């Protein structure tokens, strides 16, 4: 009887194996394509025609509350008990390359080119020129930068930061009934 119990409890469901210790760049790109393409319900961006920087040069910086760490805030938001899983995503944040989003019709621009030519405060003028030359004058000097999304292990809650030149918004995206829902959980402004 005991042998049968051990055998049954050790049986794996191979169809559900996910490497929980790693959120790949490809997984992030697929997620971003899905949520950014939804310009009807989520409306994270106005259109695929808005310029997206290939790299966010702002640092991830959550607000720390007294006696409440950034990590505690994230664990609670993501409803994640595996603190190492979340902490590893934060600790390994680097300049997340969004270049592959170009394959899905997004306007990705190499901001290193702009930063090498002009001062930080002159970036909006350069972006306006690019938007005009791309046939998108309605966007003026608008562009966005995306931080690498931070997932919970189930991949049904994600913290996504969308940065603009002098401001940014943090969204908690939750997957319910195969659809993503957004909730604004933070913002910053210079």
Question: Which residues are covered by each model-predicted region?
Answer:
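Flexible low-complexity loop/turn motifs enriched in small/helix-breaking residues
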Residues: 11-157
């Amino acid at each position: 009887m005991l042998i049968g119990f051990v055998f049954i409890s050790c049986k794996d469901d191979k169809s559900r194996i996910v490497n929980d210790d790693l959120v790949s760049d490809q997984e992030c790109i697929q997620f971003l394509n899905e949520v950014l393409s939804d310009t009807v319900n989520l409306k994270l961006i106005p259109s695929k025609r808005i310029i997206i920087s290939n790299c966010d040069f702002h640092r991830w910086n959550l607000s720390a509350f007294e006696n409440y760490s950034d990590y505690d805030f994230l664990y609670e938001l993501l409803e994640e008990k595996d603190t190492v899983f979340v902490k590893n995503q934060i600790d390994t944040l680097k300049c997340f390359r969004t270049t592959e989003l170009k394959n899905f019709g997004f306007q990705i621009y190499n901001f290193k080119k702009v930063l090498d030519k002009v001062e930080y405060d002159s970036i909006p003028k350069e972006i306006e020129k690019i938007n005009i030359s791309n046939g998108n004058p309605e966007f003026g000097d608008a562009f966005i930068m995306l931080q690498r999304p931070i997932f919970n292990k189930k991949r049904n809650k994600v913290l996504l930061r969308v940065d603009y030149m002098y401001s940014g918004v943090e969204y908690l995206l939750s997957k319910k009934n195969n659809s993503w829902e957004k909730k604004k959980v933070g913002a910053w402004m210079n």
